[in-house]
C-alpha cells in the first residue's frame, strides 16, 4: 500500500504533468484513509476534480453553442449528431460529479473538524451540484439545484464564524452569488450576496494577514468584476 506522503507526492507529479485523472485517483486514496485532510491535501483534491470536471464543462459549452448554430441553420442531421455527442459528454460529467460528491459526503465532510475544512468541502459540494445543474433539465435540474442551494446555505451559516476577509469565506460568497445568477436567474440576489461579501471584507482589509492578502484581494476583485458585469446586464434588460 502506498503511503499518504507518497500519494500526495504522486498527486503533485500528476498535477505538474497535467495528468488530472490520475491526480484524482491518488487524492481519492488519501481521502479514503479516513482522517482530516491538511490544507495542502485539501487544495490538491480540489484542483484535481476541478480540472477533470472543468475540461468537460468547457467541452459541453462548446458543443451546446455549435448545436444552437446548426439548429439556426436548420441542419437537422447535424443537430442529431451533435445531440448524441453532447449526451456522451453529459454522461461523463454525471459520472465525475457523482464521484466527487460521494467522496465529499462519505469521507471529506465526515472527517472535517476545523471550521475551514467544513466550509471548504460544503462549498465544494455546492459547486459540484451547481455544475450538475448546468447540463441537466426538468426534475433532475431542480433536484441538483436544490441540493446546491442547501449546501451553499449550510456553508454560509458555518462560514459566519470566519473573518469576512478569509479566502474560503470570500470564495464561497463568490460561487454562491454565481449560483444565484446563473442557475436561479436571480440577478438581484446574486448582486446582494456579492456586494455584502465585498463590503464586509473591505472594512477589514487592514487586518488581513500577509499570507492570505493576495488570495483575499484576488477574490474581492472577482466579486467586484461580477458586480460590475451583472449590474450593467440588469441595466441592459431594463
UniProtKB/Swiss-Prot annotation:
- The signal peptide here is none
* InterPro entries linked: 14-3-3, 14-3-3_CS, 14-3-3_dom_sf, 14-3-3_domain
Q: List all membrane-crossing ranges.
A: none
State the GO CC annotations: cytoplasm
The highest taxon in the source lineage is Eukaryota
Q: What does the entry give for GO biological process? A: protein localization; signal transduction
Q: What CDD domains would the database entry show?
A: 14-3-3 (cd08774)
Function summary? Probable adapter protein.
* UniProt family annotation: Belongs to the 14-3-3 family.
Q: What is this protein called?
A: 14-3-3 protein 2
Species of origin? Entamoeba histolytica (strain ATCC 30459 / HM-1:IMSS / ABRM)
User: What is the taxonomic lineage of the source species?
Assistant: Eukaryota, Amoebozoa, Evosea, Archamoebae, Mastigamoebida
